[in-house]
Each structure stands twice: as structure tokens, then as C-alpha cells.
Regions:
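Thiamine diphosphate
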Residues: 1-149
Length: 149
């Protein structure tokens, strides 16, 4: 029997953290651990709880990638990407081409439709779809995104 997708995501995230990487996000350890997809670990294991200031996360994640970690950034709702997309798209995604410095970031952004408001709901990955250096994947692809990360 195959594992549910949330268990696969949790296991892959745990393995990634065991390699000395970090997982960032807001309210990661809050009720449900982001739908059961975040391993129940602590900051010493690489789990980083970001503040609720929606505009600072892109810079923190980009900085983490530039110092050599391979951060996973969990965004609870894709609508919040509007606040963080600028530095990720214009600095992190272009860093390798412009300065020869790789800046790998894996962003897990949850897409939902309806019922949760005009900012949090819907799928907003189109705002970065055409940016050089950014690849978009969906759960239907399975573990392929992690292989290339």
C-alpha cells in the first residue's frame, strides 16, 4: 500500500533536515503541523519558525541559501507569495546567472480554492512562472522536484 502524500512529504522533509539543511515557515508547529506534512522536530533539528511579518521571509530564505544550506520554505497559502516573490524572483533565482553564486531554494506553497479569503486562497504560482531560474512542480510529479534540488 502506498503512503499518503502528506507522509511522503514529511519523510522527505525529515531526511532533508538530517542532512543539515533547514525548513522555514510561519506557524510550522501550530495545530496540525501544516496538514501533517512537517516533521515534529525542533529548531535544533533545522526547523525555523519565521515571524508573522509577511514581507521578510523571502530575504531570510535567500540568505540561508546563499550561505550554503538548501532551505525548504513552507508557505501556508500561495496568496502570501505576493509578499515574498520579489526578492526570491529578482535575487535568488537570478543569483547564479548574474553573479555565479547558486541560491537553491525549495518552496512548498499550498494551493487551495475558495472559502479562505481573497489573499490566502487560490493558486498564485503564475506570478513567478516565467522568471529565469525558477521551476514549478506540483504534487502529481511525486519526488522528482526533490531529486533535482
Amino acid at each position: 500500500m502506498k503512503k499518503p502524500l502528506k507522509e511522503v512529504i514529511k519523510d522527505v522533509s525529515r531526511d532533508h533536515l538530517k542532512k543539515g539543511n533547514q525548513l522555514f515557515g510561519q506557524c510550522l508547529s501550530a495545530v496540525g503541523w501544516v496538514g501533517g506534512t512537517v516533521p515534529e522536530l525542533s529548531e535544533s533539528d533545522g526547523l525555523v519558525e519565521l515571524s508573522m511579518a509577511d514581507v521578510m521571509a523571502g530575504g531570510v530564505i535567500t540568505g540561508a541559501a546563499l550561505v550554503g544550506t538548501r532551505p525548504i520554505y513552507v508557505v501556508r497559502y500561495q496568496g502570501f507569495q505576493w509578499f515574498n516573490a520579489s526578492i526570491i524572483a529578482n535575487y535568488a533565482a537570478k543569483s547564479k546567472d548574474l553573479w555565479g553564486i547558486p541560491c537553491p531554494i525549495f518552496i512548498r506553497s499550498i494551493a487551495m480554492e475558495g472559502g479562505i479569503g481573497p489573499v490566502a486562497g487560490s493558486s498564485h504560482h503564475g506570478i513567478v512562472y516565467r522568471m529565469p531560474g525558477i521551476r514549478i512542480a506540483s504534487p502529481m510529479i511525486g519526488l522528482i522536484p526533490f531529486i533535482y534540488f
